[in-house]
Amino acid sequence: ITGGGLIENIPRVIPDDLAVKIEANSWKLPPIFEWLREKGNVDSYEMYKTFNCGVGIILCVDNDNVSKTLSYLTDIGEDAWVIGQIKDDNKFNGSVDIS
């Protein structure tokens, strides 16, 4: 995840008729991002729009493959978390909701 942070990059990989719901507490925000938020007085929305907040890559995986994918990533030494879900939600089409 690069420029555009989580909010602007995730919609690029999902169809327009779907939305993404991210659980902000599903991973630990690295200390550098806590520092940036505090020292820069940056609100959460702007943090997620500007930075990856410690999420370097996102894999969109079918529910049936989540456990297998997490096991594989852990086995090869990667930190991995389920951070959200893709939803068929007309109210939030093509958007990312982080809460």
How does the language model describe each region?
Residues 1-99:
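Glycine-/charge-enriched secondary-structure boundary and capping motifs
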